[in-house]
């Protein structure tokens, strides 16, 4: 199964509370922090809400 490397490239400060919560739930703290998550519907849904804050790479 593929995995996604998610990197926070813009700050979550001054964003909607829902967006800040998603960033925290993904395990992203500071700008340029990265996490690897499974490529499933739940993760894709979270990324959809904060796509303007993160970069996503597919890892095989």
From Swiss-Prot:
Keyword Coiled coil: no
GO MF assignments: structural constituent of ribosome
UniProt-listed Gene3D superfamilies: Ribosomal protein L30, ferredoxin-like fold domain (3.30.1390.20)
Matches recorded under InterPro entries: Ribo_uL30_ferredoxin-like_sf (IPR036919), Ribosomal_uL30_bac-type (IPR005996), Ribosomal_uL30_ferredoxin-like (IPR016082)
Record keywords, A-Z: Ribonucleoprotein, Ribosomal protein
Key word Transferase present: no
GO CC annotation terms, alphabetical: large ribosomal subunit
SUPFAM superfamilies: Ribosomal protein L30p/L7e
GO biological process: translation
Subunit structure, interactors included: Part of the 50S ribosomal subunit.
Record-stated family: Belongs to the universal ribosomal protein uL30 family.
NCBIfam families, A to Z: rpmD_bact
Protein name listed in UniProt: Large ribosomal subunit protein uL30
Organism: Lactiplantibacillus plantarum (strain ATCC BAA-793 / NCIMB 8826 / WCFS1) (Lactobacillus plantarum)
Lineage summary: Bacteria, Bacillati, Bacillota, Bacilli, Lactobacillales
Name of the coding gene: rpmD
């Amino acid at each position: 199964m593929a995995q996604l490397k998610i990197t926070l490239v813009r700050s979550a400060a001054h964003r909607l509370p829902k967006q800040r919560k998603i960033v925290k739930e993904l395990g992203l703290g500071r700008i340029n922090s990265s996490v690897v998550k499974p490529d499933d519907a739940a993760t894709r849904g979270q990324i959809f809400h904060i796509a303007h804050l993160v970069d996503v790479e597919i890892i095989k």
